[in-house]
Curated annotation (Swiss-Prot):
It is found in: Cell membrane; Membrane raft. This is Neurotensin receptor type 1. Residues 326-349 are annotated as: Neurotensin binding. Residues 403-424 have a biased composition (Polar residues). N-glycosylated. Palmitoylated; this is required for normal localization at membrane rafts and normal GNA11-mediated activation of down-stream signaling cascades. The palmitoylation level increases in response to neurotensin treatment.
Length: 424
């Protein structure tokens, strides 16, 4: 990707490099829009002629490659999340699920689906192919960034809430029966969406439509860009990074590590005792003592699989979201004087890579999180078989294996179906 000289930074460059004139509005204003969005990559450049200096000259091969990747992610993500939503909408399917994990999966599927439907088409149009003018009006500009940020917050918080649900179900199963009632889970998820909307409200006042043509009248100069000062936008970026990445990542990492350690201990105890009996202890006085769970050899393998899934959840979240937020924070912590021609070009290619990873998260979540719940996975595959006759025929050819429920001795009544759900 090569940028027109009128938008390059006049910072000190490497020896032998030709310096570029400092634009009228400065590089920082241009980077604001890039750092905030999946949208208009050139939205706040200073221009003399709207149809020349606003252009970011991405080579056609990069455009085609990014478009192909986006389309593949769009198809996989929309199909996976739509089937998940359809599965959860079936009353018969819900009756076969014993825990509240399906509420969290449904909320996550909805936020991922909205990200793919709302953000990806706009980005392909207004950043990859047509950089200017902004075609959706001032209300569309503000609404786009508001909805996109709200769905981003919702996805991150839904991933964290799912980790909380799994932690309670596995490490505190008796307490979970009380805390994770259906009504409380619905209220909790509703609170997540309300908080996500409130956190995204600043975008309604941060972004707006401006005409950056030389005379302020040329229709080709309309761009969706930050309309507030640089310091305010930096605060918005930093708050977004903390609430949509650092905070959820902390919860996910800690809780999934605790769960993985618990499952690992159960596997080791089962292996040592030979007959597959493990003891899960709790420190709560209400739950007191311990209970023994007889684990068959096949279930030991399932526990190991559960540990791998938990680690994959953490790794996927970090890999897909960390580069995206690092790219946005580049604007906050790199001064105008530090931007060179090479760094500026790197930023734009890095932009495409990080946003692709951002969408990978929404596309793989239906696959990754169906591994979290064995019961939900069975219902999901059953729904897919109903929607796809070819898939139904392949499933009929596969041998079916019956799995005996885990035996359990305790002073408390606890359903074996819930135990299977808890242990994946």
């Amino acid at each position: 990707m090569h940028l027109n000289s009128s938008v390059q930074q006049g910072a000190p460059s490497e020896p032998g490099a030709q310096p570029f004139p400092h634009p009228q509005f400065g590089l920082e204003t241009m980077l604001l829009a890039l750092s905030l969005s999946n949208g208009s990559g050139n939205s706040s450049e200073s221009i003399l002629e709207p149809n020349s200096n606003l252009d970011v000259n991405t080579d056609i091969y990069s455009k085609v490659l990014v478009t192909a990747v986006y389309l593949a992610l769009f198809v996989v993500g929309t199909v996976g999340n739509s089937v998940t939503a359809f599965t959860l909408a079936r009353k018969k399917s819900l009756q076969s699920l014993q825990s509240t994990v399906h509420y969290h999966l449904g909320s996550l599927a909805l936020s991922d689906l909205l990200i793919l439907l709302l953000a990806m088409p706009v980005e392909l149009y207004n950043f990859i192919w047509v950089h200017h003018p902004w075609a959706f009006g001032d209300a569309g500009c503000r609404g786009y960034y508001f909805l996109r940020d709200a769905c981003t917050y919702a996805t991150a918080l839904n991933v964290a809430s799912l980790s909380v649900e799994r932690y309670l179900a596995i490490c505190h199963p008796f307490k979970a029966k009380t805390l994770m009632s259906r009504s409380r889970t619905k209220k909790f998820i509703s609170a997540i969406w309300l908080a996500s909307a409130l956190l995204a409200v600043p975008m309604l006042f941060t972004m707006g439509l401006q005409n950056r043509s030389a005379d302020g009248q040329h229709p080709g100069g309309l761009v969706c860009t930050p309309t507030v000062d640089t310091a305010t936008v930096k605060v918005v970026i930093q708050v977004n990074t903390f609430m949509s990445f650092l905070f959820p990542m902390l919860i996910i990492s800690i809780l999934n590590t605790v769960i993985a350690n618990k499952l690992t201990v159960m596997v080791h105890q089962a292996a040592e005792q030979g007959r597959g009996v493990c003891t899960v202890g709790t420190h709560n006085s209400l739950e007191h003592s311990t209970f023994n769970m007889s684990i068959e050899p096949g279930r030991v393998q399932a526990l190991r699989h559960g540990v791998l899934v938990l680690r994959a959840v953490v790794i996927a979240f970090v890999v897909c979201w960390l580069p995206y937020h690092v790219r946005r924070l580049m604007f906050c912590y790199i001064s105008d004087e530090q931007w060179t021609t090479f760094l500026f070009d790197f930023y734009h290619y890095f932009y495409m890579l990080t946003n692709a990873l951002f969408y990978v998260s929404s596309a793989i979540n239906p696959i990754l999180y169906n591994l979290v719940s064995a019961n939900f996975r069975q219902v999901f595959l059953s729904t897919l078989a109903c929607l796809c006759p070819g898939w139904r025929r392949r499933r009929k050819k596969r041998p079916t294996f019956s799995r005996k429920p885990n035996s359990m001795s305790s002073n408390h009544a606890f359903s074996t179906s819930a135990t299977r759900e808890t242990l994946y």
